[in-house]
């Protein structure tokens, strides 16, 4: 009986999520869904949750867009049959069970037919060299930034279960069952004042990047073009909001009444709210990393190390897209907010630095493609501690740097802009360290609150072993 149930569960999980099309994890509230949509629907039934659609109540809900409109996502949940009663009673009716069983049988037959067809095609065709296989992420983003995945990061990246994903790693578990965690998309540092001087002595500012640091020749031009296109496409597909959606004219700035409400929040509540927003942004960064050619070929340990050390750095970089230079505000909690909104955090110096960094990077007026390649360069840093295959990571980072250089030249940017961007890496790392200092102080005051109310992802990202992963700054 147990084996039969296990086999049936495996068949059910082969059917994509009915809400967003992602990898499903079983039957939840009467419908086959992924963990993220299950958690989203459960939370939508708790308390007095109210969602509204900023568009025409007809938003497309799929794996990459499901987090953009809670209203349309909930309506789709209800339309496909997710039951409010199931939240209370946790059971399916006999009719629902029979219907699902029939669907599993149909899907099984379809898979067999497809397999037969695929085998015949494989005898005639082979995959083009260098062609990337489509990724099927096993994680899901909820509208509140909460993920429902009980797997560690190794399973999260590779789509394995927790049992399958248990591999030796210098940094252990990296749980992504995300709930709330402090928002660092608003954390900068004193920008230019703290920006270390970069020792890049080449006169050209660009030619120094035309070979690998180990002396190997540059990769073929076609390889660089392919990598550049892959990263730029992945960036656009994994941005939380399109740049058009972030136009300040589409959103309100925090009003005085709203400002007072934020400032009256307790320090604990404000940290938690910010945590949710950062966690939400980090999940998009993880998806971005998974789509970068070469990342999934790295060993599992190195994937985890790079994500753990670099995901917040990329969140900071992406912040420049959501910065309004007209009034020194960033997009936060569905409004454009100034530094004063974050007063309750008790981190005025850190918040000031965050805004200064966003302003500094925004002033470079980077295109989306330039932001995407720079984000990938920041993420694939070969100087992280605990990397097992530093040379492979270094070669990937160097390829990304050369691709970025080529793009900047193609866009006729000033020669010195690449040097400026490389210097920003030290700045953003210093920001992350300052955030760690603030978090440590907060955790010392409210250890129980951090333990019980902060998202697991946030706690894993910025736990006691986080600083061991970061390269030591001079």
Swiss-Prot record:
NR LBD domain residues: 223-461
Ranges for region AF-2: 450-461
Location in or out of the cell: Nucleus
Principal location: nucleus
Function noted in UniProt: Nuclear receptor that binds DNA as a monomer to ROR response elements (RORE). Required for proper cerebellum development.
Source organism (scientific name): Danio rerio
Biological processes annotated in GO: regulation of transcription by RNA polymerase II
DNA bind region: 14-89
Homology family: Belongs to the nuclear hormone receptor family.
One term of GO molecular function: RNA polymerase II cis-regulatory region sequence-specific DNA binding
Keywords carried by this UniProt record: Developmental protein, DNA-binding, Metal-binding, Nucleus, Receptor, Transcription, Transcription regulation, Zinc, Zinc-finger
Keyword Transcription regulation applies: yes
Residues that span the membrane, as ranges: none
GO cellular component: nucleus
PROSITE patterns referenced in this protein's UniProt entry, alphabetically: NR_LBD, NUCLEAR_REC_DBD_1, NUCLEAR_REC_DBD_2
Protein known as: Nuclear receptor ROR-alpha B
This protein's encoding gene: rorab
PANTHER family the record matches: NUCLEAR HORMONE RECEPTOR HR3-RELATED (PTHR45805), NUCLEAR RECEPTOR ROR-ALPHA (PTHR45805:SF3)
């Amino acid at each position: 009986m147990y084996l039969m149930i296990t086999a049936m569960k495996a068949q059910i999980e082969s059917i994509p999520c009915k809400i967003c099309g992602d990898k499903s994890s079983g039957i939840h509230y009467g419908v086959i869904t992924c963990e993220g949509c299950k958690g989203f629907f459960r939370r939508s039934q708790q308390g007095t949750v109210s969602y509204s659609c900023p568009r025409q109540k007809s938003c497309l809900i799929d794996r990459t867009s499901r987090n953009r409109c809670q209203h349309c996502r909930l309506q789709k949940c209800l339309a496909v049959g997710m039951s409010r009663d199931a939240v209370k009673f946790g059971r399916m009716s006999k009719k629902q069970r029979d219907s699902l069983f029939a669907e599993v049988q149909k899907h099984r037959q379809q898979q067999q037919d497809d397999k037969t067809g695929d085998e015949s095609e494989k005898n005639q065709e082979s995959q083009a060299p260098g062609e990337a296989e489509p990724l099927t992420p096993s994680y899901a983003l909820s509208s509140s930034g909460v993920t429902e995945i009980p797997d560690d990061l190794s399973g999260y990246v590779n789509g394995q279960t927790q049992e399958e994903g248990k591999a030796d790693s210098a940094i252990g578990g990296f749980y992504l069952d995300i709930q709330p965690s402090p928002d660092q998309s608003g954390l900068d540092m004193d920008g230019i004042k703290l920006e270390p001087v970069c020792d890049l002595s080449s006169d050209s500012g660009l030619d120094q990047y035309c070979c690998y640091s180990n002396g190997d020749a540059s990769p073929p031009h076609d390889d660089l073009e392919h990598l550049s296109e892959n990263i730029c496409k992945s960036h656009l597909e994994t941005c939380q909001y399109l740049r058009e959606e972030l136009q300040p004219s589409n959103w309100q700035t925090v009003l005085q009444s709203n400002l007072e409400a934020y400032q009256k929040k307790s320090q604990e509540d404000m940290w938690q709210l910010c945590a949710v927003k950062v966690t939400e942004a980090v999940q998009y960064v993880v998806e971005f990393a998974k789509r970068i050619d070469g990342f999934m070929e790295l060993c599992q340990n190195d994937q985890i190390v790079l994500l753990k050390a670099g995901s917040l750095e990329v969140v900071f970089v992406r912040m420049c897209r959501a910065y309004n230079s007209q009034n020194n505000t960033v997009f936060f909690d569905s409004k454009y907010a100034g530094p004063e909104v974050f007063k309750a955090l008790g981190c005025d110096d850190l918040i000031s630095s965050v805004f200064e960094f966003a302003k500094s990077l925004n002033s470079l007026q980077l295109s989306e493609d330039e932001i995407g390649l720079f984000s990938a360069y920041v993420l694939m840093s070969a100087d992280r501690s605990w990397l097992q295959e530093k040379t492979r990571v270094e070669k990937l980072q160097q390829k990304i740097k050369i691709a970025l250089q080529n793009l900047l030249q193609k866009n006729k940017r000033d020669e010195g802009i690449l040097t400026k961007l490389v210097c920003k890496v030290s700045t953003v790392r210093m920001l992350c360290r300052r955030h760690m200092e603030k978090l440590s102080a907060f955790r010392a005051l409210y250890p129980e609150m951090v333990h019980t109310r902060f998202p697991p992802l946030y706690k894993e990202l910025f736990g006691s072993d986080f600083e061991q992963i970061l390269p030591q700054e001079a």
